[in-house]
């Protein structure tokens, strides 16, 4: 019998700081020697108190002396799951679960806008192939917003009942599947419109689902960065969609864009199933586990809908401020998203290739601004600045900056085209400060009802996608003026939205009670 005692001190297997948390660590090692000598198997046990014992030391039976086995290679140490390399592999193993969820949600939003903008590129060859007029092409593109507007409130309600995680993954699968259906239904107009409505429904429930997920997993001091990171995926998705769609269409055909982009969403849905950790709910500064029911009965769903304090929502000036501000921001966003490429081509005399590349600049710059704005907001909150003040500062920048830039672009002061492009890009990029202003306020005032509140404001915010885009075209035909049709309405809503926001917005937690309804 051989006895071996090892006394580890301050190596990577054990740490004196955490010794009281781990009662013992067990390490098994087989020491190879010359082939004529037997192997010695030892077990080393390191207790929390620092004492060691050799519980067993056993001499193995010698091998047949006739045999001349090859020298045995060292056998690696088998480590417990709480020590050594297994503790840090894979690299993302020790990343907090809430950050994994936020990263996956941001990726979903990247795919979201890729599937939103792909039609704006593919509509050109589709119109040529099927002989669509501009009115028909406009009808196909606007059908997305029908589903988007109709799904906002249901998305918020379902997120409240089942949790944002479940609603988000169903939304991603719905819009991805519907995207892949477009080539199959393109020759049948009702079917094509229905598929785009489904895309709108799937994408429409996602903002509320993400808001619920953020409200339940991210503390206030990290919330601006989380919202900026998640919703910033929309800008990245616009850039990637506008960059990838043209070469895919030129290399293959327009159908391949919908198949490939739809497949990305299905792949995300499959991968998201591996994030099975439970959600956490922030109540004040504490974290408590929250399990959502996935088998609610119809009676429970109906009861939960009745329990939502709808009247209390609409009695709050802060909620009305969010509603109008969301409408104003969406007017500028959707009208510019739809009409700026045409403006660059007609008013600034850029060719189609230049106009397409220039259209990428605002969302590309928004990615940088979003990161800076979120860090700026969280820095102010961490250093004691009132949350309401921070939200008002950020939202004011988001509205005043594009209003000034649009004014400079619309006034004939002899600016060359590329300077106008730069001014508009800067203004629209700075509007991303809204992600640290308006879009954080839903979680600030009520984490419990954040998804429903965003559903309310986003429903109103979807109206400019239907009305504003069409009205801009009508005004352009009537006045033949880009200033009056595109810029003046946007400037009006930006400025009035700023006034309402500064007067009535609040990030103070509010209690919405059913008995008040």
UniProtKB/Swiss-Prot annotation:
GO MF annotation list: phosphate transmembrane transporter activity
Gene Ontology BP terms: defense response
Matching Gene3D superfamilies: MFS general substrate transporter like domains
Membrane topology type: Multi-pass membrane protein
Entry annotated with the keyword Transmembrane helix: yes
UniProt keyword annotation of Protein biosynthesis present: no
Subcellular localization(s) per the UniProt record: Plastid, Chloroplast membrane
Superkingdom, taxonomy of origin: Eukaryota
Disordered: annotated segments: 51-73
TM annotation in the entry: 130-150, 170-190, 229-249, 255-275, 312-332, 352-372, 397-417, 420-440, 452-472, 484-504
InterPro entries referenced in this protein's UniProt entry, alphabetically: MFS, MFS_dom, MFS_Na/Anion_cotransporter, MFS_trans_sf, SLC17A9-like
CDD domains hit by this protein: MFS_SLC17A9_like
Expression across tissues: Expressed in leaf veins and sepals.
Role summary: Inorganic phosphate and probable anion transporter.
UniProt record similarity statement: Belongs to the major facilitator superfamily. Sodium/anion cotransporter (TC 2.A.1.14) family.
Name this polypeptide is given: Probable anion transporter 6, chloroplastic
Gene this protein is translated from: ANTR6
């Amino acid at each position: 019998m051989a006895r071996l005692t090892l006394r580890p001190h301050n190596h990577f297997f054990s740490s004196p700081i955490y010794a009281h948390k781990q009662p013992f660590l067990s390490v098994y090692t087989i020491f190879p020697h010359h082939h004529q000598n037997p192997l010695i198997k030892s077990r080393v046990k390191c207790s929390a108190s620092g004492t060691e014992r050799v519980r067993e030391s056993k001499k193995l039976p010698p091998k047949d002396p006739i045999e001349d086995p090859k020298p045995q290679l060292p056998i690696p140490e088998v480590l417990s799951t709480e020590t050594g390399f297994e503790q840090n592999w894979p690299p993302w193993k020790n990343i907090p679960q809430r950050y994994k969820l936020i990263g996956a949600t941001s990726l979903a939003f990247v795919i979201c806008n890729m599937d939103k903008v792909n039609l704006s590129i593919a509509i050109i060859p589709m119109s040529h192939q099927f002989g669509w007029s501009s009115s028909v092409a406009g009808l196909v593109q606007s059908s997305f917003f029908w589903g988007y507007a109709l799904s906002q409130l249901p998305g918020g309600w379902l997120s409240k009942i089942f949790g944002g995680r479940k609603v988000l993954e169903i939304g991603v699968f719905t819009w991805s599947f519907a995207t892949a259906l477009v080539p199959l239904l393109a020759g049948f107009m009702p079917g094509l419109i229905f598929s785009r409505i489904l895309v709108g429904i799937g994408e429409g429930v996602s903002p509320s689902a993400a808001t619920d997920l953020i409200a339940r997993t991210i503390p206030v001091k990290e919330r601006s960065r989380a919202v900026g990171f998640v919703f910033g995926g929309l800008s990245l998705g616009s850039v990637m969609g506008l960059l990838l769609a043209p070469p895919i269409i030129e290399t293959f055909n327009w159908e391949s864009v919908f198949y490939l982009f739809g497949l990305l969403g299905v792949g995300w849905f499959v991968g998201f199933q591996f994030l099975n950790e439970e959600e956490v709910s922030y109540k004040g500064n504490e974290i408590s586990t929250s399990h959502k029911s996935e088998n609610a009965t119809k009676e429970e769903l109906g009861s939960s809908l009745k329990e939502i304090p709808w009247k209390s929502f609409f009695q709050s000036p802060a909620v009305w401020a969010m509603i109008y501000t969301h409408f104003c921001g969406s007017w500028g966003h959707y009208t510019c998203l739809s009409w700026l490429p045409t403006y660059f081509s007609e008013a600034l005399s850029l060719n189609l290739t230049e106009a397409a590349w220039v259209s990428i600049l605002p969302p590309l710059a928004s990615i940088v601004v979003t990161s800076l704005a979120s860090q700026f907001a969280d820095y102010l909150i961490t250093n004691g600045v009132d949350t309401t003040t921070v939200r008002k500062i950020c939202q004011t920048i988001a509205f005043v900056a594009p209003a000034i830039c649009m004014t400079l672009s619309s006034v004939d002061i002899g600016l060359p085209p590329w300077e106008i492009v730069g001014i508009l890009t800067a203004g629209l990029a700075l509007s991303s400060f809204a992600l640290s202003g308006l879009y954080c306020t839903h979680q600030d005032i009520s984490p419990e009802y954040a998804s429903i509140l965003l559903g309310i404001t986003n429903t109103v915010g979807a109206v400019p996608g239907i009305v504003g885009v069409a009205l801009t075209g009508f005004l352009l035909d009537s006045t033949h003026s880009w200033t009056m049709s595109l810029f003046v309405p946007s400037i009006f809503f930006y400025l009035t939205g700023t006034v309402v926001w500064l007067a009535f917005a609040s990030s103070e937690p509010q209690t919405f009670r059913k008995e008040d309804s």
